[in-house]
UniProtKB/Swiss-Prot annotation:
Keyword DNA-binding part of the UniProt annotation: yes
Protein name per Swiss-Prot or TrEMBL: Probable cell division protein WhiA
Family affiliation: Belongs to the WhiA family.
Taxonomic path: Bacteria, Bacillati, Actinomycetota, Actinomycetes, Micrococcales
Cited Pfam families: HTH_WhiA, LAGLIDADG_WhiA, WhiA_N
Gene from which the chain derives: whiA
Residue ranges for the DNA-binding region feature of this UniProt entry: 275-308
NCBIfam families for the chain: DNA_bind_WhiA
Organism: Kocuria rhizophila (strain ATCC 9341 / DSM 348 / NBRC 103217 / DC2201)
UniProt GO MF annotations: DNA binding
Physiological role: Involved in cell division and chromosome segregation.
Length: 330
């Protein structure tokens, strides 16, 4: 499965309990994937999505949080679009939903960016805004020099609002216009990893970082000619970062983590260059690639949740800080 699809599928099944956070996510999703239409003199809210599970998540939120009935349809792919498009539509209570999600202001005028209540909400709501925008029109490219998390925006005001939400999460995002289309882009690999963590895409993060490490190690290995120390340090950096995150998780959790998760973590720390397949074979008893990946993912997720409760650096933030300090030392 492509990275973008993996992230969307995982986020579509993320459990969120707070109604305000769910509302912020839906507000961004409708703003970035939808629009307001006048049909027979009535306002209709409509959003077009490329993933069925995302569309069904939106339908549930409309019903459970706002209490409105929602239609879900599908348009078959045609022309340049091969895949079907899922259409979420609220007709009978369209105006009420538009006002409550901030698509319309108090005077009934369309909001061009994002509503102030969402922009000025909590940090969790800021993360929900970015999650909703990604589910609507986000993409994640393969790790490498051109790695990017990108959001296609309905206009410059929405792009600037998204940049502001990212800033509240200490994430550097840049708004730009490409061929008349407004976009928001996050480029730095460590920043992308941190953002995936904040959005709740822990499984996709593990997949992305595994690919990132392999690509960086392969790229460096191809450049090595004389195997000098400086090049060897660069070739090992990605593996060291992955190991540092797991070490951080073990430090944060200590004995709080279940033994089988600690064992998987210790195995990763002791074999930083090994692939997930190799780690699985080294386990006692042997595990599948998915099983060892799942254990490491759960260990990191538990540690990140605990770190946020304690107000200390998460595994990704710690690894980024350690990498920066090491780079300055050299």
């Amino acid at each position: 499965m492509a990275l973008t699809a993996s992230v969307k599928e995982e986020l579509a099944h993320l459990q969120v309990r707070k109604s305000a956070v769910r509302a912020a996510e839906l507000s961004a999703l409708l703003r970035f994937a939808g629009g307001l239409h006048i049909v027979a003199g009535r306002i209709v809210v409509e959003a077009e999505l490329d993933t069925e599970s995302v569309a069904r998540r939106a339908v549930r939120t409309v019903g459970e949080v706002f209490g409105h009935e929602c239609e879900l349809g599908v348009m078959s792919g045609g022309g340049l679009r091969r895949e079907p498009t899922w259409v979420v539509r609220v007709a009978r209570d369209g105006e009420a939903l538009a006002r409550r999600t901030g698509l319309l202001d108090a005077h009934g005028r369309p909001v061009r960016g994002l509503p102030p209540t969402v922009v000025n909400g909590s940090v969790d709501e800021s993360a929900a805004v970015i999650r909703g925008a990604f589910l609507a029109h986000g993409s994640l490219t393969e790790p490498g020099r051109a790695a990017a998390m990108e959001f296609t925006c309905p206009g410059p005001e929405a792009a600037l609002a998204l940049v502001g939400s990212a800033r509240r999460l200490d994430v550097l995002a840049k708004a730009r216009q490409v061929r008349g289309v407004d976009r928001v882009v996050v480029r730095d690999g460590d920043t992308i990893a941190a953002l995936l963590t904040r959005l709740g895409a822990h499984r996709a993060l593990l997949q992305w970082e595994d690919r990132r490490m392999r690509k960086e190690v392969r790229a460096t290995a191809n450049r090595l000619a004389n195997f000098d120390d400086a090049n060897l340090r660069r070739s090992a950096q990605a593996a060291v970062t992955a190991g540092a995150k797991v070490e951080r998780a073990l430090d944060i959790l200590g004995d709080e983590a279940p033994e089988h998760l600690r064992a998987a973590g210790r195995l990763r720390v002791a074999n930083k260059q090994a692939s997930l397949d190799e780690l699985g074979r080294l386990s006692d008893p042997p595990l599948t690639k998915d099983a060892i990946a799942g254990r490491i993912r759960r260990l990191l997720a538990m540690a990140d949740r605990r770190a946020e409760e304690l107000g200390i650096a998460t595994t990704t933030e710690f690894a980024a800080q350690a990498g920066g300090a090491q780079a300055r030392a050299h």
